[in-house]
Amino acid sequence: MSLKPITKGIAKMKFENSKDRAEIIQLANVFQKSRILLTAFELDVFSRIADTGSTAEQIAGNEIKNIRALKRLLNALHSLGLVKKEKENYFLTESSSAYLVKGKENYLEGLMHSVHLWNSWSKLTETVLNEVQPLKNEINDRGEEWLRAFINAMHMRGRRRA
C-alpha cells in the first residue's frame, strides 16, 4: 500500500498554501542566523580579522580555545555573507568592516544589547508556563557592560528614526 496519497492529502489539509508553510518554517529557524551574528559580535570576531585576511587560528588568538567550533562559526558567517573566505583565510566584507569592527565610525555597538536580550527571550516558554520573571534585578544592578549596551542600543534606534 502506498502512503503517497495519504501524506499528500494530510499536507493539503494542514497547509493550503505551500508558501505559507515555507514561511512558517523559515520564521521558526531565523533565530539561527541571529545567534550566529550575535555570537560573532559577542566574541568580537569581526575586529579580530585583519584587513589582509586571517586564519581561524589567528582570529582565535589566546582567548578562543575551540578552533573547530570557531571554524564552523566563520563558515556560517561566510554563508550569511558577513565574511569572505579564500582557502583558509577569512576576510571582512564591506558591511562587516563598516558596522561590526570596534573603533569604526559606524560600529553597531548597540548590538551587544541584543546579545543580552537573548538570555531573557530564551526563557519565554518558562516565563509563560511558570509566571517566572526572566530578569528580576533592577537596571542599576545589571552592571556597567549591560547599561552601556542598552544606552548604545537606544542611541542606535534614535539615530535611525532621526
Language-model-detected regions and their locations in the chain:
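Eukaryotic partner-binding/assembly regions in large regulatory complexes
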Residues: 1-3
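Conserved Class I S-adenosyl-L-methionine-dependent methyltransferase catalytic core
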Residues: 6, 10-14, 21-54, 58-64, ...
